[in-house]
């Protein structure tokens, strides 16, 4: 149990350095000598201390809008791993390289259900993999029109916050649309 507590404390300190103190070197002190950060949907991050330092300095720490909130939803812990489910909310008022690389601010509110899988060695972060639905982000940013596509926008975050909201709404939406003919029969 001690490892789980130490890992949770290390992860909390890591998150504080990323989002509260916004201190790259402090973040790296919570990590092993050869860490890996991988934001899977956008393929951003780095491998090794130098690459992670550059990513944090140039593309992550300090780039988040001032209204960013991270709301924990659930946590699963093991001897050397934590899996956190969370809701990340912000107003897209600046370029955020790790979420919407190269996309000019849209001024839109973005709510992202996300999962972080964090592995530890000796009480320090060695692997940090983040997953989220980039389609939902692109819909909320106004970059994709969801009409006719099996994509959710902010509804995905709303459903995470309130499990009593209806499920299967995309299926109903798609089923209500006429299926175009292939023209093969005539």
Q: How should these model regions be labeled?
A:
Residues 1-186:
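C-terminal and inter-domain tail/linker signature
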């Amino acid at each position: 149990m001690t490892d789980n507590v130490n890992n949770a404390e290390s992860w909390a300190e890591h998150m504080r350095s990323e989002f509260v103190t916004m201190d790259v070197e402090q973040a790296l002190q919570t990590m092993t000598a050869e860490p890996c950060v991988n934001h899977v949907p956008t393929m951003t991050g780095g491998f090794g201390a130098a690459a992670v330092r550059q990513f944090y300095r140039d593309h992550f720490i300090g780039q988040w809008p001032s209204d960013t909130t991270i709301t924990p939803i659930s946590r699963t812990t093991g001897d050397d791993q934590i899996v956190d489910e969370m809701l990340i909310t912000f107003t897209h008022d600046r370029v955020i390289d790790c979420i919407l690389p190269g996309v000019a601010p849209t001024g839109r509110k973005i709510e992202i259900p996300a999962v972080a899988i964090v592995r530890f060695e000796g009480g320090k972060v060695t692997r940090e993999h983040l997953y989220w639905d980039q389609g939902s982000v692109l819909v909320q940013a106004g970059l994709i029109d969801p009409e006719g596509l099996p994509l959710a926008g902010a509804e995905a975050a709303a459903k995470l916050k309130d499990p009593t909201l209806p499920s299967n709404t995309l299926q109903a939406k798609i089923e209500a649309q006429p299926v175009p003919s292939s023209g093969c029969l005539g």
